[in-house]
C-alpha cells in the first residue's frame, strides 16, 4: 500500500523529466541561453563542436537540454539527437537578416523528420536587444510558422545575455508538455 501511494504521490507531485533539443544556426545564442538558464549568468562561449547538455529545473520539471552545435558542417549530426525528444527549441539570431532563410530551411528540414513528429516547437527569437533586430512578427513570417497546422508551437522574444524571455519560453514548454502528457 505504501509503495502504491508513493508512486501515486510522485506521479502528481514529483518532478517530471523532459528531453529538450536546442538547435539553430551557429552564433544564434544557444550555448549562452543554456548556461543563462542553468547558472543564471553569462558565460564566455566558443563555437560548439559537438554538444553541451545540462539539466535545468523549472516548475517541477527537470528539462534535460541538449545544445547542439550549429555550424553548417555539423548540422547533419543533429539527427542523432532526435530520438525521444519531446520539445524542440529553435534559436534564431533575429539580427541576422542574411541567414533567416537558411534558418527557415534548417527548421523545415527538421520538422519533416519522422522522429520529431510529436515534439512541440519553441522558437527563441534571440538578440532582441539589438537595434536592428527583426520583430517577433517578422521572424514568425520568415520562418513560415503559421503554416504549421499539426504541431504545437510558440515564438518568444528573448535576449540571452539579460535573460529576458527565457523563463517565459520555459513556462510555455512546461505547460504544453505537462498538459499533453496527461
From Swiss-Prot:
Subcellular location: Golgi apparatus
SUPFAM superfamilies assigned: P-loop containing nucleoside triphosphate hydrolases (SSF52540)
E.C. designation(s): 3.6.5.2
Reactions performed catalytically: GTP + H2O = GDP + phosphate + H(+)
Gene3D superfamilies found in the cross-reference section: P-loop containing nucleotide triphosphate hydrolases (3.40.50.300)
Protein's UniProt name: ADP-ribosylation factor 1
Alphabetical list of Pfam families matching this protein: Arf
GO molecular function per UniProt: GTP binding; GTPase activity
PANTHER family membership: ADP RIBOSYLATION FACTOR-RELATED
Function description: GTP-binding protein involved in protein trafficking; may modulate vesicle budding and uncoating within the Golgi apparatus.
Gene Ontology cellular-component terms listed: cytoplasm; cytosol; Golgi apparatus; pathogen-containing vacuole; perinuclear region of cytoplasm; phagocytic vesicle; plasma membrane
Superkingdom as given in the UniProt entry: Eukaryota
Cystines in this chain: none
Binding site for GTP: 24-31, 67-71, 126-129
